[in-house]
Amino acid sequence: MSDEPLKLLSLSARAARALDGSALADAVAYADPDGVWLPDSTPEARAYATVRDAVSVPVVHPQLGRDGDSVVRHARVDGELTAVGPDATPDFDVLTVQSSAVLDDLAAAVETGERRPAGERTLLVVPGLGVETDATSLAATLTAGEELARVQRAAETPMTVLAGELPAGYHHDWTLEETTVPVYGCGPPPGHGETPTFAALRCVPAGSVAATPMRTSQFGLRALAGIGATTATRLRDRGLESRTDVRETPVRDLVDVSGVSRANAERMHAHAEVLATGDPLRLTNETLPVTRDDRPPVCLDIETDGLSPTIIWQIGVYDPHDDSYQSFVERENPDDPGTIIEAFLDWFLATHADRTVLTWNGYRFDYPELERFIEKYAPHYAEAWDDVWTYDLYKWAVRDENALLPGRTNKLDDVAAALGFEGADTGLSGAQTAAAYQRFMRTGDPSTVAWERHERYCEDDCRALWHVYAAIRDAGRRATTDAATDSGGTQAGLGDF
């Protein structure tokens, strides 16, 4: 079976309606999915038609199906996601049902041989599937759990469930009648106010699903810095429907749009260029974080058991000077957080104490947590660690507004991918690594964690950080002058980026 992940775009009807044609095409182009799923449990014909009109990949919404269409099946055929029949035997398939009411019939069809299971893994999409909580006992129950257990027993092939009523990013391994079924959410992720959200899902054949939440405001005209809903409407009224239109319009003409200042015009124009070219833009003459010698900074990342950690269970350091990577992982005793801290400091202070350390958003998380754990578990090294030069590239580029980056968000993996970084494709997120270690802490069973995969995830972050640093280091600068902006646009500042 191929290890290539299946990429699905889970797009609710509400999100589809909030995206105009240009923004919808932009979202699909950005996510580059194998298919688009509408996880709504009710028929949404207009949203379905809107999405089908905008994309060339399969669009799946079985709520509109007629007799015999209550279950649809897809698998990769010659590299493309294609509808396949019940007698096909792909290694990895996607079954989508109209509702949980269909699950018993699905199980019966598999039991009788009317439907043949996949060879290695089935991804089962169930709109309307969610979790109910008893108000008295507070016990949580997965709706249609018995039916899912029956499907899993009948198929025998490992199954991963995508639940339409649970938000993208949700994950729990449910034990259903002595059968364990991993359940992930594919509904709209937690939102940002009234802005509709949706998610790109990377489904790894081994069974895990990584969700990348997205907002409708990240696509189309609103993807550009300085453009809100009102400005987007005013630009469209002037015939500017896309970022390409903004990029090709002189700044002096953008200023003519009601409510657009020259600074905002420069901002949106420069951002359009950055997103189009994929090249970062240096906005100031500020130097990048300095080093103590001619060697580049070492890139550091930590993994914890949550945002209020009780342990730093993995520390990774990538040294671009000799392309080496060193990791420290607590695989045996999560009750002793000091062991990994001391091991890391023994190595780092002996071999790299004169090097500059670089992180992404480290001033907000990595450095404070490291300092807290050092003070508690290795106080004899606290003063030596204080002498280490530490910098935060995210602060320098984004919060201090020294650079404009091509990612749709300023998350490291998003920025690095936009800059051409090709990682290990682990299918993991920071939340999943934390959840995996929490499970290990609860059970004490190290076999519950795919250690090598989680180590690759941390190494990926370290190497991605260096890739972003090098891209910014080599990026051009844009001067802000009337002549330059009128002929090509510049960027004065990024206060609201």
Where are these regions (language model features)?
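Long, highly charged low-complexity segments
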Residues: 6-8, 248, 256-298, 302
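Low-complexity, acidic/Ser/Thr- and charged residue-rich accessory regions of DNA metabolism proteins
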Residues: 490-497
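Acidic, Mg2+-coordinating catalytic module of metal-dependent nucleases/exonucleases
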Residues: 103-201, 405, 411-489
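Helix-hairpin-helix
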Residues: 214-268
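RNase H-like nuclease fold core
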Residues: 297-330
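Conserved DEDDh/DEDDy metal-dependent 3′-5′ exonuclease domain
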Residues: 5-142, 152, 327-417
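Acidic active-site catalytic centers that drive phospho-/nucleotidyl reactions
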Residues: 301-303, 392, 461
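Long non-globular sequence segments
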Residues: 189-192, 201-211, 233
